[in-house]
Amino acid sequence: GAGKTTLMQALAGFRKPYRGKVKLAKGQRLCMLPQNARSLFVADTVEKELLDSAGQDQAKAMQMAEKLELTPLLARHPYDLSGGEIQRLAVGKLLLREATVLLLDEPTKGLDAYAKAELAQLLRALCQDGTSILIVTHDVEFAARYATRCALMFDGLLLSEGEPHDFFAG
């Protein structure tokens, strides 16, 4: 590929760059959502997943469940959720770790149009609350519609970047 996932892994600290350095501004907390969000799940219920990420703080976990409309799903196994519900739970787990920067690798993969719109609404709200979000995607329509900036990578190089309107216009 172009190196998108490798770049994201370097930003997250999972890989060491061959050249250069990755630095975060002081106080920033970065978390990454992998392509397979299910790989984050180890507990047998949605509630336990949230509690684990909240450091067993019941109030904090339930507040996140309410915010992400996961309350009706608390007793369900994470693997029994729909694609959109899985993404919401995964993002909730990252936010409970007090992430200020989210790296999302192919977050729309396998989602239907409704789940994509739901995810976009959540991401927009997070941005308004001050969370920075970097998304790697092949979903050009999603990027054009919801991103504030877009970039094109090819063979490990950043070839172009700009606001979606300008980026996709020419």
Regions found by a protein language model. Name each.
Residues 102-105:
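Catalytic Walker B motif of ABC-type/P-loop ATPase nucleotide-binding domains
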Residues 137-138:
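H-loop/switch region of ABC-family ATPase nucleotide-binding domains
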Residues 58-73:
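Conserved ABC ATPase "signature" region
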Residues 112:
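ABC-family nucleotide-binding domains
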Residues 143-145:
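A short, surface-exposed alpha-helical micro-motif characterized by mixed small hydrophobic
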Residues 77-81, 85:
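Conserved ABC ATPase signature
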Residues 157-170:
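Conserved beta-strand-loop-alpha-helix hinge in the C-terminal portion
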